[in-house]
């Protein structure tokens, strides 16, 4: 590929760059959502997943469940959720770790149009609350519609970047 996932892994600290350095501004907390969000799940219920990420703080976990409309799903196994519900739970787990920067690798993969719109609404709200979000995607329509900036990578190089309107216009 172009190196998108490798770049994201370097930003997250999972890989060491061959050249250069990755630095975060002081106080920033970065978390990454992998392509397979299910790989984050180890507990047998949605509630336990949230509690684990909240450091067993019941109030904090339930507040996140309410915010992400996961309350009706608390007793369900994470693997029994729909694609959109899985993404919401995964993002909730990252936010409970007090992430200020989210790296999302192919977050729309396998989602239907409704789940994509739901995810976009959540991401927009997070941005308004001050969370920075970097998304790697092949979903050009999603990027054009919801991103504030877009970039094109090819063979490990950043070839172009700009606001979606300008980026996709020419």
Predicted segment positions?
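A short, surface-exposed alpha-helical micro-motif characterized by mixed small hydrophobic
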Residues: 143-145
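Catalytic Walker B motif of ABC-type/P-loop ATPase nucleotide-binding domains
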Residues: 102-105
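Conserved ABC ATPase signature
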Residues: 77-81, 85
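Conserved beta-strand-loop-alpha-helix hinge in the C-terminal portion
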Residues: 157-170
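Conserved ABC ATPase "signature" region
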Residues: 58-73
